[in-house]
Amino acid sequence: MPQRPFSAAVRVNASFWLLVLLAAIVSPLTVVAAILTAAALHELGHLAVMRYYGVSVKRFRLTALGAELDAPTLARLPYGRELIVTLAGVTVNLFCAVLLALLGLRTWREWCFVFAGAHLVLAAFNLLPVVPLDGARALCLALSFFLGPATGERVTAAVSLACSLALCALGLKLSLGLHSGWLFAFASFGLLWGTLRQLGLARGAKSV
């Protein structure tokens, strides 16, 4: 019988609360609630598919860049199944975005469109090919399948570093012209830090 994947120890990093505080300062509470809801459903999507495949989670840690899962058995899955786990969160967000948009055409227009937008933004953000986001993991898995793990990790690391540096430059530019641009800059430098921290890690280190 597989271990229960939801019996993991849950930790919340200070960076998560800092991001929530910064978002609350520059955004309406409705937007903050929409983003937090979308993020929660995103992570539940990952966990639901992991449970389906019998993957146990020992530790669940929330950070400003998402959730870090200590799931040693995840690396034992075939590339295809691990890719499904990786993209499960984004799939949930896209499904919810479509559902909310359709609902917004009939009722609660403003609320539905705000929450649908949050799901779309979170999905797009997570598809960026930057470690530790889902897009980078999906890219690494695809490249590893065709070219081998070593090549996949090297190429993903190079792409991740280039993209995170470009995002930091864009974040600095936006922070000079937009009231909320510094929040984007904060997230961009957080991604750069995450990329540098995880460069060189072997297959099996998971952030989803």
Model-derived features: positions:
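Hydrophobic transmembrane alpha-helices and their immediate loop junctions
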Residues: 1-208
